[in-house]
Amino acid sequence: MKKTAIALVVAGLAAASVAQAAPQENTFYAGVKAGQGSFHDGINNNGAIKKGLSSSNYGYRRNTFTYGVFGGYQILNQDNFGLAAELGYDDFGRAKLREAGKPKAKHTNHGAYLSLKGSYEVLDGLDVYGKAGVALVRSDYKFYEDANGTRDHKKGRHTARASGLFAVGAEYAVLPELAVRLEYQWLTRVGKYRPQDKPNTAINYNPWIGCINAGISYRFGQGEAPVVAAPEMVSKTFSLNSDVTFAFGKANLKPQAQATLDSVYGEISQVKSRKVAVAGYTNRIGSDAFNVKLSQERADSVANYFVAKGVAADAISATGYGEANPVTGATCDQVKGRKALIACLAPDRRVEIAVNGTK
């Protein structure tokens, strides 16, 4: 049975197209399943029954056919992880006791269960999952007369008892709306028979039931996933006149520079995932070494101000370029006198702030 079920599922997977493994979040699904179950352990816990089975006249049929329906709600499906709540109703099958080839007793079980199902996508369209929950199981006990095999209604009983339910399995999305699954499920300590003549005495017979099932489910609301628009990129550049921001030849911010920098910070703060680059420049007056040092110190002063306002230190850089990239070009080449030259070269003394990020 197991090999056949696995072969059918694998064959289906080979012919299937790739789809999302778990259902989309906040959607429902419903399905059916069937397979083979087996009763375990409980029969060996009853000394009288165990002794009887040692005789060749007795036989215990533990294997059974199982089937059920289920429905679920997909709570989460993010980063390959999924979480769903699943409700189902199963016929968990029946065990039969025979004596001399005739039916002696039957133990039948069916009921509803509620479980949480956690899943992980291991391949495109393929999930492995585990379930844990509780099942309310009705167990019916039927007995038959020794002589003619007719049912003995006086001994018959039924109980309703909660049992732990656990399962592991794999699920494959053949289509976004259609999935197949193969799982192994087990119930713990099912039923507890009490004879009619001694209702306060429980026979020590409460097996657990394991079953392997193949199922198919339909997923509602599995249209194409909404396309998330890529964030719009934003690039902004600000140029600050150093004569307004700094004293000539100095790297300390002037008091009046605060208003200008606060205005720039207001623009920066509107950019998400931002990266800020501060570049300092000087004019050509003075040595190259001094100009590079001064431009670096000015860039650092501006960057430190923005960090103090709230820009992450690892999201901002400061670089001094000295007299590189002058904006005046050859405009001031014919200017005579130091004061006049300083005034003409004022546009070269600047701090540029480049901001890149998203809206």
From Swiss-Prot:
One protein family per Pfam:
OmpA
User: How does the record comment on the protein's domains?
Assistant: The extracellular loops are most variable in sequence, and in some bacteria confer sensitivity to phage and/or colicins.
Q: From the Swiss-Prot or TrEMBL record, state where the protein is found.
A: Cell outer membrane; Fimbrium
Practical applications according to UniProt: Immunization of chinchillas with this protein provides partial protection against subsequent infection, suggesting it might be a useful vaccine candidate.
- SUPFAM superfamilies membership: OMPA-like, OmpA-like
The encoding gene? ompA
Q: Which residues cross the membrane?
A: 27-37, 64-75, 83-91, 110-121, 126-134, 164-173, 178-185, 211-219
Q: Provide the disulphide bond pattern.
A: C332-C344
Which GO terms of type biological process are on file? cell adhesion; monoatomic ion transmembrane transport
KO phenotype (gene knockout): No fimbrae seen on bacteria, the outer membrane blebs significantly, bacterial adhesion to human oropharyngeal cells decreases about 65%, significantly reduced ear infections in chinchilla.
CDD domains documented for this protein: OmpA_C-like (cd07185)
- What more does the record tell us? Non-typeable Haemophilus influenzae (NTHi) is a primary pathogen in otitis media (inflammation of the middle ear).
Q: Which UniProt keywords apply?
A: Cell adhesion, Cell outer membrane, Disulfide bond, Fimbrium, Ion transport, Membrane, Porin, Signal, Transmembrane, Transmembrane beta strand, Transport, Virulence
Looking up HAMAP family in the UniProt record yields: OmpA (MF_00842)
Q: Which Gene3D superfamilies match?
A: 2.40.160.20, OmpA-like domain
In chain numbering, the residues marked as site (Part of salt bridge gating mechanism) are: E86, R181
- The name this protein carries in UniProt is Outer membrane protein P5
Which superkingdom is the protein from?
Answer: Bacteria
Its membrane topology, per UniProt?
A: Multi-pass membrane protein
**Residue limits of the OmpA-like domain?**
233-359
Q: Its function?
A: Acts as a fimbriae subunit, allowing adhesion to host cells. With TolR probably plays a role in maintaining the position of the peptidoglycan cell wall in the periplasm. Acts as a porin with low permeability that allows slow penetration of small solutes; an internal gate slows down solute passage.
- Oligomer status and interactors: Monomer and homodimer.
GO molecular-function annotation terms? porin activity
